[in-house]
Amino acid sequence: VPHWQGEVGLCTDFFQLAMLSMERTKSIEIGSAVLSILANGGPIAVAERIGNFCALQEVRGDSRRLNVGFSAGRFQFMAAPYGIVPRNNVEDVAWSALRGKIFWEACEIMLRLIRGDTIHSDDIRETILNRNDFRTEEDWLTVQNAHGEDSEEIKIPRRYIFEEIKSIPQNWSRKQLNLVLGSHQPELQTHVNKFMPVQVFNLSITQPEVIEATHERMKESYMGDWERRMMPRTVMVFLNEEDGLSENEKIECANEEAKGALTSYWAALEGTLDPMKVEKAANNAIIGNAATVAEQICERFHPDDRLMLWFDFFKHDSSRICRDMRAFMDKVVPLVNGGGN
């Protein structure tokens, strides 16, 4: 990460945290946004953790869902310790495109194991590179040269090799699992729904027209009845409802807090995200006191959207984060839902 100082891309064991949280609460569901399935032991290990968690939930008599948002992980260093690195010169020069293809392979393995299939690595889709996978003709020519011939397609050996396997336990309720794919690729969003019902995330900076196109596509491809809330809208929240401040002072303080955090956010993205996405980015933050935050939500989001709120970016004051979340629920939500003045 070229322009970031501090912790990023942490691979925490989400399932242990989820179990502890559910043991201490009655109504709250827990989710990951997002879990890298190329890290964390890879797709087979993640599938086993999911099945084991949901089975234990049934034993405990807890019917709450586990919400697993999963992705390849933005940062290469997260997956590298798990062997997700180029294996030869062809893979090295093709890596920007190939890493995404490995994620396709991992998705199919994980989803089929979760579904209860018995699979062999030969059953999984092959990875094939062609010109369409690369931004420029020059990039594709570089890969062809490394391959040693100008083939229209280059077959890449599978990343995961295994004999017939299945995940144990087999008998658990899949209704207790909600899967959400963190990928902007339309083809992958459609592909994963061949195996299991999989909802979708988009980046917080995704343009509105892309959001609407995704909803239309998911109406056709989702394994089930698609609802708008099934694609959470990620948004950073810079809310100030601190005591002792006037309404204008709250807004000024919120803007100051947001300025520093968002500057760091954009710096962190540089070199880790497709520059075209950054260039076309949409506003990804709501900023101000309760009234202005509520107004921004009503102006920018569809009434049926579900918001996934990010309160803690660049904040290390846990008590302040808790106050902000409480203020959001007590003061912002009633205004958005029509219960306030």
Regions found by a protein language model. Give the residues of each.
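Outer-membrane beta-barrel translocator/channel fold
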Residues: 69-87, 91, 95
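Acidic (Asp/Glu)-rich catalytic clusters
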Residues: 18-27, 53-65, 191-194, 218-226, ...
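An alpha-helical appendage that flanks or caps ligand/catalytic pockets
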Residues: 89-170, 207-305, 339
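Glycine-rich anion/phosphate-binding loops
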Residues: 38-55, 285-292
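Long, low-complexity C-terminal extensions of enzymes
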Residues: 288-340
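The substrate-binding groove and active-site-proximal loops of carbohydrate-active enzymes
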Residues: 4-8, 31-41, 94-97, 282-287
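N-terminal beta1-alpha1-beta2 module of alpha/beta enzyme domains
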Residues: 1-28
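Hydrophobic faces of well-ordered beta-strands that scaffold small-molecule active sites
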Residues: 30-33, 64-70, 177-183, 197-203, ...
